[in-house]
């Protein structure tokens, strides 16, 4: 499950995933963008590999490239989108309160992430989390929204 609950939205990096997935928009709206990888140097490329030793993915520099927008589409409630592990994409124009639920297949590939040209592997690290009490409140609010449908 993914909840976009902030008043401001940071544009996602262009990225792929380590596994195929299918997502359904439960509430809200977003734009799903698909990209092609092309020769160039404006974006730093990183491979995300799962490191068994540390128990999480790590970023490995992978040169420089360009990402060329192939298509965009606006998706709303009850719409579904699927991506194979190696498809480059991101989402944009996400409505606050958007909730998606995803089903993931088994990890099969390294993920690819494209960042600004001067990015380094450390720029790919993000610590995220939520206190258990806040998580309970968020999940209860989502449950109420689903029940009200």
Residue ranges and their predicted role:
Residues 14-16, 93-96:
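Short glycine/proline-enriched turns and hinge-like loops at secondary-structure junctions
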Residues 36-86:
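Short acidic-glycine-tyrosine-enriched beta hairpin
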Residues 105-149:
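Non-heme Fe(II)/2-oxoglutarate
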Residues 1-16, 38-39, 85:
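Conserved short histidine dyad/triad with adjacent acidic residue
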Residues 18-32, 36:
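Short, conserved beta-strand element in jelly-roll/cupin
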Residues 35-37, 94, 103:
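Surface loops and adjacent helix of pleckstrin homology
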Residues 32-33, 83, 88-94:
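Short beta-strand His + acidic residue motifs that chelate non-heme Fe in jelly-roll/DSBH
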Residues 22, 96-112:
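A short hydrophobic beta-strand segment most commonly corresponding to one strand
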